[in-house]
Amino acid sequence: MNALLSNPFKERLRKGEVQIGLWLSSTTSYMAEIAATSGYDWLLIDGEHAPNTIQDLYHQLQAVAPYASQPVIRPVEASKSLIKQVLDIGAQTLLIPMVDTADQARQVVSATRYPPYGERGVGASVARAARWGRIENYMAQVNDSLCLLVQVESKTALDHLDEILDVEGIDGVFIGPADLSASLGYPDNAGHPEVQRIIETSIRRIRAAGKAAGFLAVAPDMAQQCLAWGANFVAVGVDTMLYSDALDQRLAMFKSGKNGPRVKGSY
């Protein structure tokens, strides 16, 4: 197999195209495939707050592979060994949470690169990513198809944003609204005017630096606002929240005293 690796999600980011995504927290390949047939540009398979194992992530990657929706994997942390596993099962785009400094960003880049450019362990012959050794010259071409996104979601990270943006190998920065608002002293209140101001200025700084800017907005008006500020990969919902809301709304049609979806906090 002499296939060239490609990453449509990364290619579209390079062109500055807007991509609309969906957060997957349900942990099942069945739900992931349903989402993949809906037409979202990208699907975030969450390993940080959803109880996904490596095998769960693997099965969801398999489920969405036949479709145009591009998978993005968020591991639970920036662990070098965990990043190695996630890459080996075939993830091409990673979203790394809680990156606060340029040094941390450089460590993440190193974890995704094979020597001599980094510290990723070599195991292509047993990895789905290399089709079990059948993709010729996998190690030589993989860096071009790898897309690395980091999350800025604390006051410390905001203080180091410019330095993080200067790190070679970082393709985009994602603003984490829930953790960021808590870090700024406004827990569960990402809609606070000061938080909104900081989100706007951060998105504009990211784009001015030539990087992609991402966001998760469960409220449609907030998603539209982030797009207007320049964000170019925006998730507009979470599968478990959408499912929960739909269940509540359907029940409210038939049971008195039910008034639709429950109030949900920030995510």
From Swiss-Prot:
The keyword Magnesium applies. Keywords: Lyase, Magnesium, Metal-binding. Pfam families: HpcH_HpaI. SUPFAM superfamilies: Phosphoenolpyruvate/pyruvate domain. Disulfide bonds: none annotated. Binds 1 Mg(2+) ion per subunit. GO terms for cellular component: cytoplasm. It catalyses: 2-dehydro-3-deoxy-L-rhamnonate = (S)-lactaldehyde + pyruvate. Its cofactor is Mg(2+). Coiled coil: none annotated. The active site is at residue 49. The record marks 88 as: Increases basicity of active site His. Its EC number is 4.1.2.53. Mg(2+) binds at residues 153, 179. Substrate binds at residues 151, 178-179. Belongs to the HpcH/HpaI aldolase family. KDR aldolase subfamily. Homohexamer. This is 2-keto-3-deoxy-L-rhamnonate aldolase. It comes from Escherichia coli O7:K1 (strain IAI39 / ExPEC). The gene is rhmA.
